[in-house]
């Protein structure tokens, strides 16, 4: 990097290594966590549960000790309301705020006489490892999609807290609740917990029970669970590690400074894989990262800018040789995956989902023939075509991995995937593996595909293109006021009077997902060769337009332009 480049603002240096001026002051962040107190009259400082829990930063007084104490107390009361009496598993990622937030949560849980299990190795815990552990500990109990016992007796059931803001920047914190089904909590649960947490904040935390930090160590209700051993030991039940080992597939795994760092080394050792942990460094500033598209440090393993160093490392040399057959990335809690191949570079998440589905449904012979293919409605229609070729039902659901939980839990849905590089699938015998997204699993699947087929996932995608066509896909943002976003969220098909989109007859106008009839919180319009979906942003005054065309980039541009005009007209 030249001296002139170093002088540029961060937003003008995407894909380049972070500089000292780009890094957070960890001490100041932790001090803000301890001393900041939210203004409950400010919506930006209240507890808000999105699809991935509550997120914020201590610097903006949206993720502080008060928030975590209130949320944890609310979770305790939610459990009591439903008679859930088993231990709470608590895991954390490598973000600076995750450690102190775990301390807060444990103190409140113990203050309420709740049994707590933390990582027995004192390490970091990926989201999928917590999900897998919950399912393991609740094995033998028949659970409903909401996470409760079918027989109505929730006594002894285990649930969990995962402290992570996922791929968010280093100054952020995040806090998720996973009910006894192991997956993301549904809207009923998150609304209840958020409302109660905000009541507790408004009351100055009156009603929050908590032990002193000095009383945590040695507390009778505090125990340990070996998340890593359980997860790594069980991998042969879901991935053909023997095929990967025997084929000698060379894997380069980049934890991106996240919770998967110890897992990858143990996976290599335990299963005898030719696997190199590309960057084993853990730094709460994430100072080893390259900057994302907007100049922020973001552990987004689907971003070419955030993955720039790994992509560069995988570039074949003059002799056409690359150091690995596949390189992989995971975000901070390892619920997302990034796949880099020598012949294709960083794969588009939609492309890899299509490849994974095509491979799995052809190579998991014990999976029930009646099980459909789960996708979110903003994922590529290449998946629709692959599902049709496989003779499988397409199960299209709204955005949010929680919608895949019922299928993964019962085996009626053996795979669920999102366009944002999150997916999971069941074990060889059809039993659940993880009801939350599992980035390690999807990375290992890429190695299995190479081992079994002799082709890279990129090659496999080119085969799918030859068979089904080559879609152009993109997402753009369009401005919208809060009132317009609210209107978009509650549209009905009758509000859309048009019959054509970009020269094609509209075949479907959807405001509910066809796979489960749940509201999509927006609009999807489908033609023979294209579609678009519009959804309001939860954090900005914009709405997102996802669009795809099998007629090429120019037609996609036309679809996007007409989609924006249509939506703007409808929401006024």
PLM regions with names:
Residues 57-58, 87-93, 130, 250-254, ...:
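Short glycine-rich or small-residue beta-strand-to-loop segments that form or flank ligand, phosphate
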Residues 120-124, 195-228, 341-417, 422-425:
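Proline/glycine-rich low-complexity loops and linkers
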Residues 2-45, 141, 153-155, 171-320:
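Gly/Ser/Thr-enriched, mixed-charge loops and adjacent short helices
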Residues 27, 81-85, 89-172, 266-338:
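N-terminal small/polar loop signature for handling phosphorylated ligands or for N-terminal nucleophile
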Residues 322-326, 363-538, 542-572:
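Phosphate-binding and adjacent anionic-ligand microenvironments
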Residues 100-109, 171-178, 335-355, 383-386:
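Short Gly/Thr/Asp-enriched flexible loops that form oxyanion-binding sites at enzyme active sites
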Residues 44-63, 165-168, 255-266, 415-420, ...:
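Conserved phosphate/anionic-ligand binding catalytic regions in large, soluble enzymes, centered on
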Residues 72-88, 240-247, 321:
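Glycine-rich phosphate/diphosphate-binding loops that line cofactor/substrate pockets in enzymes
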């Amino acid at each position: 990097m030249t001296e002139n480049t170093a002088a540029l603002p961060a937003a003008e240096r995407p894909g380049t290594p972070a500089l000292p001026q780009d890094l957070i002051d960890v001490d100041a962040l932790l001090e803000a966590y301890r001393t900041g107190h939210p203004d409950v009259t400010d919506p930006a400082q209240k507890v808000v549960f999105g699809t991935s829990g509550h997120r914020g930063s201590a610097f903006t007084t949206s993720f502080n000790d008060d928030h975590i104490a209130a949320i944890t107390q609310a979770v305790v009361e939610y459990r009591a309301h439903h008679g859930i009496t088993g231990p709470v598993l608590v895991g954390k990622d490598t973000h600076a705020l995750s450690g102190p937030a775990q301390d807060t949560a444990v103190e409140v849980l113990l203050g309420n006489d709740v049994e707590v299990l933390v990582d027995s190795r004192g390490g970091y815990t990926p989201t999928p490892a917590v999900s897998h552990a919950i399912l393991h500990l609740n094995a033998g109990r028949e659970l409903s999609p909401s996470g409760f016992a079918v027989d109505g007796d929730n006594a002894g059931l285990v649930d969990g807290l995962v402290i992570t803001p996922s791929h968010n920047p280093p100054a952020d914190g995040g806090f998720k609740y996973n009910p006894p089904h192991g997956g993301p909590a549904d809207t009923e649960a998150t609304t209840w917990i958020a409302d109660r947490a905000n009541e507790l904040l408004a009351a100055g935390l009156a009603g929050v029970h908590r032990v002193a930090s000095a009383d945590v160590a040695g507390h009778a209700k505090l125990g340990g669970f070996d998340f890593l051993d359980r997860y790594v030991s069980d991998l042969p039940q879901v991935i053909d590690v023997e095929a990967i080992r025997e084929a000698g597939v060379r894997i380069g795994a980049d934890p991106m400074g996240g919770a998967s760092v110890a897992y990858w080394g143990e996976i290599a050792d335990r299963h005898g894989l030719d696997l190199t942990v590309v960057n084993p460094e853990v730094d709460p500033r994430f100072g080893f990262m390259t900057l994302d598209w907007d100049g922020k440090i973001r552990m987004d393993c689907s971003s070419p800018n955030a993955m720039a160093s790994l992509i560069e490392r995988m570039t074949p040399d003059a002799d056409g040789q690359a150091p690995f057959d596949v390189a992989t990335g995971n975000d901070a809690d390892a619920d997302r995956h990034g796949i880099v191949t020598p012949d294709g570079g960083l794969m588009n998440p939609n492309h890899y989902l299509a490849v994974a589905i095509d491979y799995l449904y052809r190579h998991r012979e014990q999976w029930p023939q009646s099980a459909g293919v789960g996708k979110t409605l903003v994922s590529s229609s290449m998946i629709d075509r692959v599902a049709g070729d496989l003779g499988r039902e397409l199960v299209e659901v709204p955005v949010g991995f929680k919608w895949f939980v019922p299928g993964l839990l019962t085996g009626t849905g053996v795979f669920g995937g999102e366009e944002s590089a999150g997916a999971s699938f069941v074990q060889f015998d059809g039993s659940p593996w993880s009801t939350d997204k599992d980035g390690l699993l999807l990375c290992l699947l890429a190695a299995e595909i190479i081992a079994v087929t002799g082709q890279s996932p990129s090659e496999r995608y080119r085969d799918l293109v030859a068979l089904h066509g080559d879609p152009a896909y993109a997402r753009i943002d369009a401005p919208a006021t809060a009132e317009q976003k609210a209107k978009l969220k509650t549209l009905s098909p009758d509000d859309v009077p048009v019959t054509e989109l970009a020269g094609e007859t509209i075949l479907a106008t959807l405001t509910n997902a066809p796979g489960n009839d749940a509201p999509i919180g927006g609009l999807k319009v489908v033609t023979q060769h294209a579609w678009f979906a519009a959804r309001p942003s939860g954090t900005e005054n914009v709405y997102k337009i996802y669009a795809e065309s099998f007629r090429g980039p120019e037609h996609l541009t036309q679809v996007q332009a007409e989609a924006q005009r249509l939506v703007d007209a409808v929401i006024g």
